[in-house]
């Protein structure tokens, strides 16, 4: 998408893990960025955006809320493109239908209506989730964009994060139809577990899972049992790549590498021996096969991944150490951020409650 003047784009959930890195990369390329956050006046949550290179001239903050119809109208008006990153997340919700599922679906539909009103938006890029693809009773060896999670299975089992899987699946399907009806080019990007360095001030929820072998979050082992991973920077570059490619439409898996929990444990043990990671896992077969997410469609478009699994974890661990979010050795882990965040003692957060994609509170 070549423009005579720098194109203007809107990024939702801009203060979070994915959103803030995406804003940084867009600014570097000369884009005029309208970043939506729930409270632009809360400097603790937006300072890292305002301090980015080119922010003074190319970045503006806009107040918007997924739960309020028309909330994004002003931010989107006049934009060439929209990157919808924000999503409600609250795995402990007592009313997931009304607090998670409906707001997620209505949020993306409201944004599409805002895009239609603007009449200038050429493409909407939506950050979906691996949870829309492979949540089913039996795992396949390889997944691609044609696969969808089994909603009946999810509702019957109601496993951890079930409402998130349902909300993202239904939202993506609804968005595809609504974008088509409104003649808006729609791209959905399906990332697996996102790992890497970060600039947002809070501890990214996805890293609680990714670093669970270090921080002792055993309840997250089921997620990394047969995991797939992508570097945060590769994911954000993918967003821009598909936005700028006029041929890009539909779903795109953005996954660089897969690994079983055993393979991940061996890598961490070798590269970061200061952390005592477990080597055996009750109920998990040592010969566990990997489950792959195929990025063939994306790669065939010309996209190139830059980072491998070791790069991802080095970036994440280094950032966590620098920000004081991760102890420097196993002996300090129980005093670290993970335990504090679960107890609600860090940045006013309470565990994973009401944290957006990734790290923005979206629901009161």
From Swiss-Prot:
Its EC number is 1.1.1.219, 1.1.1.234. NADP(+) binds at residues 45, 164. It is an enzyme of class 1 (oxidoreductase). SUPFAM superfamilies: NAD(P)-binding Rossmann-fold domains. Pathway: Pigment biosynthesis; anthocyanin biosynthesis. Pfam families: Epimerase. One of its GO terms (molecular function) is dihydrokaempferol 4-reductase activity. CDD domains: FR_SDR_e. GO terms for biological process: anthocyanin-containing compound biosynthetic process. InterPro entries: Epimerase_deHydtase (IPR001509), NAD(P)-bd_dom_sf (IPR036291), NAD(P)_dehydrat-like (IPR050425). Keywords: Flavonoid biosynthesis, NADP, Oxidoreductase. It catalyses: a (2R,3S,4S)-leucoanthocyanidin + NADP(+) = a (2R,3R)-dihydroflavonol + NADPH + H(+); (2S)-flavan-4-ol + NADP(+) = (2S)-flavanone + NADPH + H(+). Belongs to the NAD(P)-dependent epimerase/dehydratase family. Dihydroflavonol-4-reductase subfamily. Bifunctional enzyme involved in flavonoid metabolism. This is Dihydroflavonol 4-reductase.
